[in-house]
Amino acid sequence: MDSWLEYDDIINQDIDIPSNDLSGSGTLCVGVHSSLLENSLNSIDSFISSKEEISWCGNQSTPIATKSHLSCINPQYVNPFDTSPVSVDTEFQDTYLLDAPSFAQPHFSERQSVDKTRSRCLSRNRRRKRHPNLHKNHQRLLGMSFPQDGFRRMPAESVNFSYFRDTGFNEPTIFPSSDTQNTRQLNLSKIATLIGYDCPLALVDVVTQKQIPNKMDMESWVKYMSLEPSKRGRIYDVLSLEVSTTKLAYYVRKPNIVRDLDLVNTVWPPGSFALGEYPHVDTYCLMSAENSYTEFHIEFGGSSAYYNILDGCKIFYLIPGTSKNWEAYTAWLTSSNDSDKKFLPNMVDVCYCVEVHSQQTILVPSGWIYAVVTPCDTISIAGNFLTFLHIYPQLSIYNLELQLGIEKEYQYPYFESIMWYTAIHFYLAFPDNSSRDGIDDIIAEYETGRLFDINAFTEQELDGFEELLNYLYIRAQILRDCDIIIDIYNEPVKISKNNGYNSAYTMVPPDLDEICVDFVQKFGAWITYHHRRSAKHPSCNCFSHLQTKLIDSGPKPANNSYQHQSNFIGVVISTNHNIIKKCQESQIQTGKNNCSFQLVKKRIKSTKKAPSWRSIIKAFKKRENTRCNFLSSLHATTFREDIVVRPKIKSFVLEQLIFQALFSFAINWTPSFFLNHSNFENIALSKETFNFGGEANCENTDTTLFTTWGDQGFRPSDSICYNDFNLLETANSDAEASIHELELQPLNAVNEREVDISQTDMTPSTALDTRVDTRVDSLPEFSNLILSPSSNDDSFQLDDLLSPSSSNLKQQIQKVVPQNSLEFSVGEKEKKAAEYSLLHTFSYKRLSMENEKPDTTKVPLKYNIQHEEMKAYRRKNDLEYIDQHFASSKSGISNGRNNNKEVNLTKAENVGIKKRRIMKNENNIYDFEDHSPVREKWGHRLRSRGAS
């Protein structure tokens, strides 16, 4: 052995051998005289006792067959990436021709390699204590003792997906790098050839731990590493060289278990993945000089990490990822005290020291805190990956990064998008037993990767999904511009400026921002189904900590910057009957008679005085037997026994509370219609004339048709009031979700509408619309109306809306509403009604995320359209608008994007960029025909079909 090792330096030298000598049969020409080699064969054989030890042969070793005449082989003429097995003549003993590693001494067996490397590291560590260029914390670690780690060293075949699901992957795992390809022959010069000698490198100064971009190119780095460690001066480390897009990626790859667990490989859209549009953080080439040190850190985004040591050795100092240790890490990171007592290993309960050698791989779980010491020149392949096993620590670390103000470039790229895609993937891949609807049709258009081989989720995984639900619930509120953000535990959440609406809107998948609330509701129901128990969902009980804040804060002062206002205060995620029942039985719900629901509209700064709708009140409560029927056209329809909800513009129809005769004109009634109590009285009041109402200065093409009957023109107004309850729904909200159950607020905390007389034409008809004190005393039980469009499997009838004690109300309705909706006089009233057949009501346009903010407060303004003006308007635009309307609302023709899609009960249509959910119900007694209406003398009459 000793005589062989004397020639280590000779073996490392490059050898020039003529090509005609390659087939010779005299001596083995490797720069060593054949007599010396033959004398050393017996010593070599003593180290190779079994084929198991042969399999652990050191780096860059090539097995060859020895016969009576040894062939002359030059390692430089051997394909370094040829992985074909070499035939071994069993008649002779196996020997190894060693092309020694560039940065480490050659070794023959793993046992000897570990012992030699460890002894070499210890001898060097003694000298490093006096090394002037070592990092100060590196010197501290050399003087400390650490307990022996209990981490498992496993064979490669045992490291699989099932093992990590069973164990939870909560501890580091070390195993031989048997599934890596072509890495035994890689050295620094070959890596430089594959990635290019002109490739710029970002170096890390080990002493200062600061990254220096473009400090060297690859050619300069090769020259730097060729120097003796004592002659290099400052110590540099290469940690951020991502090589997944270089030729080196063909010769290195992630371990199989990493590919199986990586969420990017699974949930990221395959189309984008194939185009290379995905987070590139999974394949780094680390080239560390001797004495390199990486400070204690947690991987960005709480991601897990793998290190495959190609050549050399690394020492890991590992601290378990617990909440207590995270707090200690945060305190150490923000502390200015640099004493030994404030050194992180002294602030935690335990710190492990693990050595990883050549051709070994270590997996570090999410949330673990660790530092890395490189005792000798080392090349390794490393990467980061997110898993569904560690959703809780990943989200915790991501939030910690935001609190510490970590810059975006040092965070996990597209982290929030991956969380959205993860929820979509598992929701589609492992469906629950709920019925599918239009939201599912939209979600199903997202591409997902391969499926996990999972029969049932573990408790750790389901707890992670609950944490993911909480995170997405908060992000959905941000996308809806809520002033007050709460989590699913009803606790307020503080959102930093750099993580607000702009960030949420950028990271949400395409079109999901329009249905984010509905999807979060469905994902909560999905968790409940798979958890076999009720998950913690937000409920309407979360008003207690918001009530005082809303009262104390008062109206926000106007300033030059746009203020994001809330479209709703709280969203109820409860599609499970048990959760709805608990919400009904809660103590807060029992005190609803003293409270009202508040919905704050989005406000835009104004330089002019205009009426402000600061308070939008609704008196709905949730109920277990709730069903929502959605309109079968874009504008109008009628129903016989149901409440109809229009989620896109939040309009609804209360059957038997509106004149049935008017439905023949295809009216889409908004909740504001109910302000005028005269609308609920006898039909004989038709002589009283109401002017049309609309909303001026709006910038949206989403319109709603209103028609009149006789001299009576019905206009959208503000609310329907009874005692301390106001019912108001916003037809102009930009919220794409359907009506949600909102926070309870005392009525006296609601600011009344302010009406500027100078800006409003105060005719007798408009005066009716500005009466906030209007009461509908004839509807004593109207506050019992309930609505929950998000509950897809719930249903209710009109009788369920009314309590048993409201028989008088039923009698009043029967007196007011004709039993036959077609019983109305056709004559002069109908002719005049045709003259008022069109009226556009507009919706607020969603504000863009650009810096240019409107400087005008856009609120609904009441205005009068005289008879002659409306007549001229009708003559010009009626035919064109009606034809366009019917072309977009035909039940048999789908949108241009989906003209090849056949839909039976549910279909998703694209309107512009947004998708609208339209459900068809067989109980509709009026609907549009499949062709445009016939033009008659007095205008256009919308014919109904299916009337009964």
Swiss-Prot record:
UniProt remark on cofactor binding: Binds 1 Fe(2+) ion per subunit.
Record-listed Fe cation binding positions: H297, E299
One of the GO BP terms on file: heterochromatin boundary formation
Substrates-to-products reaction catalysed: N(6),N(6)-dimethyl-L-lysyl(36)-[histone H3] + 2 2-oxoglutarate + 2 O2 = L-lysyl(36)-[histone H3] + 2 formaldehyde + 2 succinate + 2 CO2
GO molecular function, one term: histone demethylase activity
Binding site for substrate: T294, K314
Subcellular location as annotated: Nucleus
Highest rank taxon of the organism: Eukaryota
UniProt-listed Enzyme Commission number(s): 1.14.11.27
Enzyme superclass (EC): oxidoreductase
Gene Ontology cellular-component terms listed: heterochromatin; heterochromatin island; mating-type region heterochromatin; nucleus; pericentric heterochromatin; subtelomeric heterochromatin
Similarity section: Belongs to the JHDM1 histone demethylase family.
Role played: May be a histone demethylase that specifically demethylates 'Lys-36' of histone H3, thereby playing a central role in histone code. Represses transcriptional silencing by negatively affecting heterochromatin stability.
Protein name: Putative JmjC domain-containing histone demethylation protein 1
Chain's gene name: jhd1
